[in-house]
């Protein structure tokens, strides 16, 4: 995953930039096995995703769609949301890059995502996010919408890789883990039409900049 200067940028974590605040351990084969055993105690297991710089978005896609195919769609939607919410996210972009450049870079395939993208994902898709670490407390991003939000579960490895986390019985099932609710401004009705039905089907929606702008302007 080390192309296009990502070594310099890989630790972007928004309000939690320091490694002490977002801990990780070396991802040797021994540690990977230990991590799996740690998750197994909670009836969980890792659904591994490809380590190609898109791992965060692949893991999100696995949670929401049941597979990794639409990872770029999730990347583009999340980054567009960040762009539309510049006042919220710009303060957490590293000082060596301006916000416009950050957004432009993050739209690129294989650009590493981190804390900013996780927070945007939680807000855009109305989900909580739990991130598991080896021998460390879980890291939780609670959705601001409050009650009723479903939860994305991820594992974080060696400070540079995310995997999807599923119940043991759901590994390789191809079924979505987490149901999200996001209003489609172009289809919205009084009863609240959504991009995804509660049966977990969907995944075909890519939001335009105009749609996300409408979403942000819609009264809650």
Model segments located where?
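Aromatic-enriched hydrophobic runs in primary sequence
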Residues: 11-16, 20, 31-38, 66, ...
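Deubiquitinase catalytic domains
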Residues: 109, 114-219
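Non-catalytic, low-structured ubiquitin/UBL-interacting segments
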Residues: 1-48, 193-220
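Papain-like cysteine protease catalytic cores
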Residues: 24-42, 47-143
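Non-transmembrane, interaction-prone segments in cytosolic or luminal domains
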Residues: 4-11, 104, 121, 159, ...
């Amino acid at each position: 995953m080390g192309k296009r200067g990502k070594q310099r940028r890989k630790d972007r974590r928004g309000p939690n930039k320091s490694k002490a605040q977002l801990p990780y351990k070396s991802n040797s084969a021994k540690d990977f096995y230990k991590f799996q055993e740690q998750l197994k105690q909670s009836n969980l297991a890792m659904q591994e995703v490809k380590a190609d710089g898109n791992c965060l978005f692949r893991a999100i896609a696995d949670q929401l769609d049941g597979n990794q195919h639409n990872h770029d769609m999730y990347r583009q939607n999340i980054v567009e949301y960040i762009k539309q919410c510049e006042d919220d996210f710009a303060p957490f972009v590293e000082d060596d890059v301006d916000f416009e450049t950050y957004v432009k870079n993050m739209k690129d395939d294989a650009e590493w995502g981190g804390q900013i993208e996780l927070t945007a994902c939680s807000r855009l898709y109305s989900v909580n996010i739990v991130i598991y670490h080896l021998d460390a407390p879980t890291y939780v991003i609670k959705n601001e919408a409050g009650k009723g939000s479903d939860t994305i579960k991820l594992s974080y490895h060696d400070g540079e890789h995310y995997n999807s986390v599923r119940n043991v019985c759901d590994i390789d099932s191809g079924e979505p883990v987490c149901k999200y609710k996001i209003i489609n401004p172009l289809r919205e009705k009084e009863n609240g039409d959504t991009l995804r039905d509660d049966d977990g089907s969907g995944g075909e929606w890519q939001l335009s900049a105009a749609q996300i702008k409408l979403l942000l302007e819609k009264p809650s």
